[in-house]
Amino acid sequence: MCGIMGAVSERDISKILLEGLRRLEYRGYDSAGIAVIDSQDRLKRVRIQGKVQNLADAMQETAIAGNTGIAHTRWATHGKPSEQNAHPHLSHGEIALVHNGIIENHEHLRQQLITYGYQFTSETDTEVAAHLIHYHYQQHENLLLAVQKAAAEMQGAFALGVIHQKRPEELVAIRKGSPLVLGFGIGENFIASDALALRSFAQSVIYMEEGDSACVTTQDIKVYDSNRILVQRAVHPLNSDSEIVNKGPYRHFMLKEIFEQSKVITDTLESRINSIDVLRASFGEKASHIFPVVKNIHIVACGTSYHAGMIAKYWLESLAGLPTQVEIASEYRYRDVVVPDNTLFITVSQSGETADTLAALFKAKQSNYLASLAICNVATSTLVREADCVFLTRAGIEIGVASTKAFTTQLAAFLMLAAALCKDNRAQEVLRQLQELPACCERVLQMNEEVESLASLFVNKVHALFLGRGVQYPVALEGALKLKEISYIHAEAYPAGELKHGPLALVDKDMPVIAVAPNDELLDKLKSNLHEVSARGGQLFVFVDDSQNWKANGARLIKVPSCGAWLAPIVYTIPLQLLAYHVAVAKGTDVDQPRNLAKSVTVE
């Protein structure tokens, strides 16, 4: 969500901060700002509503420069998107603060600070933090201690970066429930909400642990734990290769990432399967002891990852015979859960920092689960550190807010898990099909131009209906989510068998209905449902197996290359991604950074 960048250097850091923000744009934001302490120890700030480029233009007009500073991209939570609510926020013109997260007790703290004489100029919870730190600094004249004491009074999940004009040589950071990274350079050190922002600037990084605070100077970074005790944290080398964040020949990151799926699935499978078995060590050292005694499975995730879990339920129950329950993390964490004996708890997240998913994992660790397994794309994430077992997908950095390659690698991971838990020879057929999956994806990507030709038929639509049966129902859900995320068309998905129970009332000559129709045991049932749509004049678009002889009957048939039955949910996802992409491009929306959305949802 919000992006934080900060630096203390022997050189001017304004351009470094700006470049860091550019690398964080993918997280989603509505405003941006920067604050630096200049050579005369004056605190200078520039804020704008809109894009980072607008901030760059404004910075040129003010000639802002300095050796210590912080910068921020804001995704609105408290207070509307505006320059007034943009970060950094100031207190008494001395303290500047950037913030990612939510301070839940901000109203109580605001009233308390008003009684102390503080005045507020914004609608944000962030300004509360700035004034509270100023209050404690007045008592102690120690910026690190002031930040630590203020954070102890604040409830919620947040990360802060703070500078003080009277302390131009230092930058203070603290993390409570929201990720923050410390970066080591030469004659300069950094903070950021994502290591991606530090590539080519920092040589190595520390991933702050829960409750950590840090004092950053040009010469050193000192880290303190939640008890304010000086500690040593692991230092990790940082890959400075920036090519991975370039679009290359593609117009958008999303299209690039769609076309990377064959490669990243190959990478995810590599050295983890052969023709007869799944290497259980791929799921962590404990997996070989845990898997044989699993009797039930609970999967908890959000958004696209939740859809991956829904598909996995079909595979795990069919192949492994294990009762599987799938829940949305924000619902799971607030209800009483009955945990059967020997239940494996699985969390799924691209970033490994999704707030509700992490909270669900922490809740599960206090419950009677056999063990926890995290399926995640980021090796250094909190989710990975906290789980008993881990499967790392190898999707690489995903910039587009609408997830594509992260989703299909999650599905590949789940299909491997189902094969690993399967107790009969069907596992070998699954493994054979998995080895064919990258080639199947390549063939499907050749449909790009055909799918693009459909886009004009959707440009003026307001609604769309997606249908699937069985394991293809979650695929339809994912297709609908992609279309609504980036084209802003209201799209819903239903099991095709539910048409007569309500959704059929929506079907008319203006309603596009998209169906996912692989050659499986439910195909004839699906055809009957689609006849109901045709009979009512619905605009029917059917993604069909190219080996099938369909009678169009007024429907637009889009033929998908044949694939193994176990692979169909993965393969049929790709043309739906392409459809959403091309419709969004035709409508002129911001494909990589759709309105109101964030890449990594790090607040509740």
From Swiss-Prot:
Annotated protein name in UniProt: Glutamine--fructose-6-phosphate aminotransferase [isomerizing]
What is the protein's species of origin? Legionella pneumophila subsp. pneumophila (strain Philadelphia 1 / ATCC 33152 / DSM 7513)
One Pfam short name: GATase_6
The record ties this protein, via PROSITE patterns, to: GATASE_TYPE_2 (PS51278), SIS (PS51464)
Query: By which gene is this protein encoded?
Result: glmS
The answer, when asked if Transferase is one of the entry's keywords, is yes
Question: In UniProt terms, what function does this protein have?
Answer: Catalyzes the first step in hexosamine metabolism, converting fructose-6P into glucosamine-6P using glutamine as a nitrogen source.
Q: Which GO terms describe its cellular component?
A: cytosol
Q: Which residues form the Glutamine amidotransferase type-2 domain?
A: 2-219
EC number(s) from the headed UniProt entry: 2.6.1.16
